[in-house]
Amino acid sequence: MADSKKSIYQQAGEWGVPFGLYLSCAAVTSIFADWFMPLQFLFLILLLGTPLVVYYFQRRRFIQDDGFTEYAGLWMLGIMLFLLGTLICSLIVFLVLQYVRPTYIVDQTQAAVDFYKTLPQMKDSEMLEAVQFAIDRKILPTPIEMVTSMFWFVTFTGSLLSALTALIAQRPLPGKRRERKQ
């Protein structure tokens, strides 16, 4: 009988879809949190839960391999999860920013400028003038530019997070001893 064990990449491909939907939920709750305040709390829970979700997938793979998955394999699984998950999330966030909330970027930037103008030390700030200039001239980043930046940021930070969770996911299985390679 042929070995039907999936490669790290196949596994990440399967698990990346639900992970992408998870990341999408977090991003969309963040986008709509200014309209419905309880979403801020939900966003915080989803954000803090991200390492646990990555750990869950890495640990699941480690257990499937009877504790013999190397650190590099678990880390690669995490990287690929973030790569695929962020790709799915980016598509959804782009659609939301482009078609559902097209003024989101301008609204949030203007809200930040208005808030900082209330602070005495920021009243005559050149930074605020520059940002207000960008708002007035309509030269703020477009949804695709924001999503592209988000994609690279989340993928990079996710790879670092995966390095950490892979270390934890490798803890020995109960009742099993790992043989050291000589």
Model-found features: residue ranges?
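Transmembrane alpha-helical insertion/packing segments
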Residues: 1-62
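Individual transmembrane alpha-helix segments
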Residues: 133-156
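Functional transmembrane-helix hotspots
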Residues: 91-120
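Membrane-helix interface/capping segments
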Residues: 58-73
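Alpha-helical transmembrane segments of multi-pass membrane proteins
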Residues: 10, 14, 18, 76-85
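Low-complexity, acidic polar-rich segments
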Residues: 120-138
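Alpha-helical transmembrane segments of multipass membrane proteins
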Residues: 18, 22-26, 30, 50, ...
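Short, charged juxtamembrane terminal tails flanking transmembrane helices
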Residues: 1-5, 172-182
